[in-house]
Amino acid sequence: IRIGGQLKEALLDTGADDTVLEEMNLPGKWKPKMIGGIGGFVKVRQYDQIPVEICGHKTIGTVLVGPTPANIIGRNLLTQ
């Protein structure tokens, strides 16, 4: 995927609600959010209206940035 001008590898996860990326700097304002995973709850930064390109397909959506074992593309971007 290409996000914020940076090229990253990510997993397409149809079971994940949200798109969560490992620590990176994104432009714009963010707000704190808590998400639940297998290891319990994690505090992440929520960025809205971020342009993302997945295999040549462009979309704009909400991206969460925080401590995650892998970059995950969730249903919020897959359904667009």
Spell out what each predicted region is.
Residues 2-80:
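Aspartic protease
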